[in-house]
């Protein structure tokens, strides 16, 4: 299953790290975040380094998107997921 993560603060990082450890069942294709460089720096120790994607790209390429972004971003995220018929799991406020 191809998983995309939106938001890469403390929650997004922990979600990505756990999925990376369970990589036989799941595959994180990448992350969308306001801070692109943070993704590269924080995932250098992962089994598979993560790629940065735009919001459109991550919703289009993922089977499931996990929303770890601040609640203010939810409306835009859910609209993109609806546009691309992508399943959405939200773990943020």
Question: Which residues does each predicted region cover?
Answer:
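Short acidic low-complexity segments
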Residues: 48-61
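N-terminal Rossmann-fold NAD(P) dinucleotide-binding loop
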Residues: 12-13
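Glycine-rich Rossmann-fold phosphate-binding loop(s) that bind the pyrophosphate
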Residues: 8-9
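ADP-ribose/adenylate-binding Rossmann-like module
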Residues: 66-70, 77-93
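NAD(P)-binding Rossmann-fold cofactor-contacting core
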Residues: 22-44
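Aromatic pocket-lining residues of Rossmann-like dinucleotide-binding sites
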Residues: 19
